[in-house]
Amino acid sequence: MRKTMVISDLPHEIESEILSRVPTKSLAKLHTTCKRWYALFRDPRFVKKNFGKSERRLMLHSNFGVYKITDDLHGILNSGDPSLEFTSKLSNLKISEDLTITKIFHCDGLILCSTKENTRLVVWNPCTGQTRWIKPSKRYRSDDSYCLGYVNSKSSYHNYKILRYCFYYNDQDACVSEFEIYDFSSESWRVLDDYCTREWGLFCHGMSLKGNTYFVAGEKETGFFMLYFDFKTERFERLPLPYQSFDSEDTAVLSIVGGEKLAVLHQNIQSFSNEMRIWVTNKIDEAKDLTWSNFFLAVDYDIFNLPSVNNVTSFLLDEENKVAVCCDRHIDDEDKTRIYIVGVDLYKEVYKERTKGAHFNWPLLISYLPSLVHIQEKYPKDKRKGNKRRLVKRIT
């Protein structure tokens, strides 16, 4: 009888090559099939090779929850009557109660979630279900913000770190800046003293690109500029923006394009023009090599009879179709979270919901690639505290 060859009979190199081409979400369901595959799917070289084999997914943080959107970006844009469908609220991060998630930050398939009052932090892989809980700094404040990044490693797991930052006025009415780093390998927080006297402010949600975080920042003397934090050197560096502005009321938002580029959306609130503009960078290998396109997209909101102030909090860009999917918080007779598609001659609202909670609960729309990346685990302490790290239900 002729023997049928199965994948386990193949040489390891060929087996690995075949599996690396399988969509990531399918592999996540197979990781417990056998010990060999379990080890392979945790190999950083295999994870890097497989990254990008699945379609991008959309996720919305709104009303203190995180929601999965059914379609990807192209599915929404190609629909004859586009609208967003939410399959489920991602409540699988709970331990004994539903968590109030106040902020999220995306970094290469991992989501950093901040809970109410920043009393707990959790890093979560929505593809594999793995989580790691992080104890906040002893200096933490309820208005802290956090970014997740890493130091790139070609041969081993990335060394992940968390940047904590906050700005506040002390008893002498002086502005104080605080920056701290949490290192996953040392499981500890430490202060970045060099930056406690900086006078610039951050004006948008940070965006992670290739392990580093980019912001739009500004100060009175120089106006707006782009700022990036290098998790390897643990230093901030200034980069140029494609426009000049000194008005802190302007809308300025960053987005990641295809995992290789940055885009910036700008709207001058004080000008007589009701125009939104978007620029895109070149492919970025090193931040110092960043350059901006002359111009990518300009949209005149007056054409669509829209209000002059649109509080865009996040956006996604489709370079091929030259359209943007914008998420904003619209304040008229009632406070609403909106998502709409906009282009030179296009405006289509695809989602609107009344916003709940405090004024700081800004919605955030993100696009992410499912990843098998493994979150560094804590040893050996966690073995005595199994409830601190657990697998949660995968997104299906």
Swiss-Prot record:
Sequence ranges of the Kelch repeats: 163-209, 253-299, 338-386
A Pfam family reported for this protein in Swiss-Prot or TrEMBL: F-box
Residue ranges occupied by any F-box domain in the UniProt entry: 4-50
Keywords, comma-separated and alphabetical: Kelch repeat, Repeat
Record-given protein name: Putative F-box/kelch-repeat protein At3g17540
Superkingdom of the source species: Eukaryota
InterPro entries: F-box-assoc_dom_typ1, F-box-assoc_interact_dom, F-box-like_dom_sf, F-box_dom, Gal_Oxase/kelch_b-propeller, Kelch-typ_b-propeller, SCF_F-box_component
SUPFAM superfamilies cross-referenced by the UniProt entry: F-box domain (SSF81383), Galactose oxidase, central domain (SSF50965)
